[in-house]
């Protein structure tokens, strides 16, 4: 809470000198207006995404369109836009939904599916790695990462909502290889080719660990498939948004 107060005071001082616009709808005098901020507290959607090993559960806040798309772009590219609270709230929704998807939720009513053969019976210990998609060295240097803070929020909520015996940790386990280029502005085929062989693993999870990949946007799934390759497999994906109809 103290961090939120400090961020609020800082935004107020900056706003008094330099007018701001809502990152989502461009309304004046708000970094995020109440309507756009509420997108982070809407229910998460559970869908699926194709991977090299078959469909993976995909938990997302919505489509890559409208205010949600503009908020993500501002988080990645605007030095004046602080959407930390938005990422925290959205991550909490995603993490809570993941508990049901993975079959580790503390409440039986929260379960929407489980990973047959992967999740031990109730009472057994379960380890979950929450792995953020890798950022370029430039984005890391500028402090404009989105996947890492989102992954931390996802992990906190997943741990808080999980049954006893479930251990959740954020593992920043994947890096882009030298020479890997940005995916921004690329078409589907270019994205797929651009991500093939572009990553390396700093750590590989043991076979009995559940692995969740977290990214700000999932488009063609090229990043997910490359993370799956270097980590030896994934069990679910969490993202702020994805293109197309949520089903």
Specify the residue positions occupied by each region the protein language model found.
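Glycine-rich phosphate/pyrophosphate-handling loop used in enzymes and phosphotransfer proteins
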Residues: 1-247
